[in-house]
Amino acid sequence: MRALVQRVSRASVSVDAEVVGEVGAGLCVFVGITHGDGPDEADRLAGRLAGLRIMDDTDGVMNLSVSEVDGEVLVVSQFTLYGDTTRGRRPGWSAAAGPEHAEPLVEMVVAGLRERGLTVATGRFRADMVVEITNEGPATLMLEV
């Protein structure tokens, strides 16, 4: 399971020109699922995201988690995080889990974040989405569990 994490001052996701999820200050997280992932990875990722210390403290140092600053999280499913570009010019997607396996696991990540007290908005699974992000820092990290 992979997550591309961006610290944001705001983020939103739209489907067919309608905003389906938006957050203020916090994190925008793109989540990719691979074949061997399961509930344990989903829970571990939710815990790492909730505790990841990339939010600024009063001295401007990345020392606080999104939980500690009452931040919000936008979660967007992103199968392309498992794109393989080692051969040719067109990515291969064989490492990405199919939707029947991936969707419940993304939902488990969202549930795990909510269980940890976070406000979470989401995109729409399998939809063509437009994501608007105001990246702070910029601070962008890749997590893998």
Predicted regions located by residue number:
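RNA/tRNA-interacting regions in translation and RNA-turnover enzymes
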Residues: 9-11
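Compact, glycine-rich, soluble single-domain proteins
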Residues: 18-70, 83-111, 115, 121
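Residue-level signal for inorganic ion chemistry
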Residues: 45, 76, 139
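Active-site pocket-lining segment
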Residues: 71-80
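GST superfamily/GST-like fold recognition
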Residues: 119, 126, 130-134
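C-terminal edge-of-domain segments
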Residues: 131-144
